[in-house]
């Protein structure tokens, strides 16, 4: 039986490109090589597409993918050169120009099946402000927030935020993930500085009420028939779960399943599946919740391309449900092919 070609697209132009490399290396080691032949393509920080390694068997633990530090520009190709009939693309890309609909649109123009959510749901979920407004219309609870858009009166935003929220607040670029550019502010001075920092990553800024809460995550998998995992908890040894804690210091542990009561567990799974459908998602996502000390549940974020590193919550959640990493990849590929056939059918 011939092997299915799986193309890993990784790297990218966003500030989350280092996470993408870690995720892609984890995927390339988890693949079942009796069923797949893996090709990898690196997208550099400046946007070049570089042809990199190919694998017909599991790479060694010392094998590393190309990065911006080891780039070989003589291997640069045209973006459209990744096309291969029958291949499935796994865009292991995080953040802007990766999970915001850009790559998804490019792959649809190439007529290639790809793992993950479609153009619309990717772009909606990428923007935290838009996501909140869509989920509000679906009746899903969220923490109170205000918004600052670059060019607006900053002093007025500060005054409106102080009137609507209480310190501490968290300031986030609307179109970033992996906790990049997020700051905690406990005064007007810190809030101003946090907004200015976030503006270096995005022109749309979300300011959220800080809540004393546990961070609980639910994995989602499927197309029209979506399935959810039991919730898992991010147990932190830090003030908040920032990029440094997630990917460098690794100052977190995972509790799977989370030790929460059954009603909260059920509610989170229902909210997660509702959110997935509300944005028109397909393939996969991870829903991140806050569980307040009073038992109140808030949906914090919908992540359409969660991390796939060896310590990432998403694959661990599915492993607990009885779907190991290799089987998860195989199912994601199947879902990608299913959606591709459906999209193509709609164009006839």
UniProtKB/Swiss-Prot annotation:
Function: Cell wall formation.
Alphabetized UniProt keyword annotations: ATP-binding, Cell shape, Cell wall biogenesis/degradation, Cytoplasm, Ligase, Magnesium, Manganese, Metal-binding, Nucleotide-binding, Peptidoglycan synthesis
This protein's record includes keyword Manganese: yes
Annotated cofactor note: Binds 2 magnesium or manganese ions per subunit.
Compartments where found: Cytoplasm
Pathway annotation: Cell wall biogenesis; peptidoglycan biosynthesis
Annotated organism of origin: Streptococcus equi subsp. zooepidemicus (strain H70)
Residues engaged in binding Mg(2+) 2: 301, 303
InterPro entries hit by this protein: ATP-grasp, ATP_grasp_subdomain_1, D-Ala_lig_Van_CS, D_ala_D_ala, Dala_Dala_lig_C, Dala_Dala_lig_N, PreATP-grasp_dom_sf
Name of the featured protein: D-alanine--D-alanine ligase
Residues reported to bind ATP: 162-217
Reactions listed under catalytic activity: 2 D-alanine + ATP = D-alanyl-D-alanine + ADP + phosphate + H(+)
Cofactor: Mg(2+); Mn(2+)
GO cellular component: cytosol
């Amino acid at each position: 039986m011939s092997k299915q070609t799986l193309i890993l697209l990784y790297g990218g132009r966003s500030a989350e490109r280092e996470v993408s490399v870690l995720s892609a290396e984890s995927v390339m080691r988890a693949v079942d090589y009796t069923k797949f032949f893996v090709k990898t393509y690196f997208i550099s920080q400046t946007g070049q597409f570089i042809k990199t390694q190919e694998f017909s068997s599991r790479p060694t633990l010392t094998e590393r993918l190309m990065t911006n530090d080891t780039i070989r520009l003589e291997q640069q190709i045209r973006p459209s050169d990744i096309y291969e009939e029958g291949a499935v693309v796994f865009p292991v890309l995080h953040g802007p120009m990766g999970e915001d609909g850009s790559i998804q649109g490019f792959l649809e123009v190439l007529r290639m099946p790809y793992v993950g959510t479609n153009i619309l749901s990717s772009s909606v979920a990428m923007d935290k402000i838009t996501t909140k407004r869509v989920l509000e219309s679906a009746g899903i609870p969220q923490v109170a927030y205000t918004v600052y858009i670059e060019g607006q009166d900053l002093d007025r935003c500060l005054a409106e935020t102080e009137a609507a929220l209480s310190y501490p607040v968290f300031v986030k670029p609307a179109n970033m993930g992996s906790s990049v550019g997020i700051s905690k502010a406990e005064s007007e001075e810190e809030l101003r500085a946090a907004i200015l920092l976030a503006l270096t990553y995005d022109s749309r800024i979300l300011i959220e009420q800080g809540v004393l809460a546990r961070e609980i995550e639910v994995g989602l998998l499927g197309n029209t028939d979506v399935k959810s995992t039991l919730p898992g908890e991010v147990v932190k040894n830090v003030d908040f779960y920032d990029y440094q804690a997630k990917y460098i210091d690794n100052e977190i542990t995972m509790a799977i399943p989370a030790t929460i009561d059954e009603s909260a567990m059920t509610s989170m799974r229902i909210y997660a599946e509702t959110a997935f459908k509300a944005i028109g998602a397909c393939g996969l996502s991870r829903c991140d919740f806050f569980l307040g000390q009073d038992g109140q549940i808030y949906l914090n974020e919908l992540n359409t391309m969660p991390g796939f590193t060896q310590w990432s919550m998403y694959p661990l959640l599915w492993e607990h449900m009885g779907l190991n990493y290799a089987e998860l990849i195989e199912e994601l590929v199947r879902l990608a092919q299913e959606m591709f056939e459906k999209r193509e059918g709609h164009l006839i």
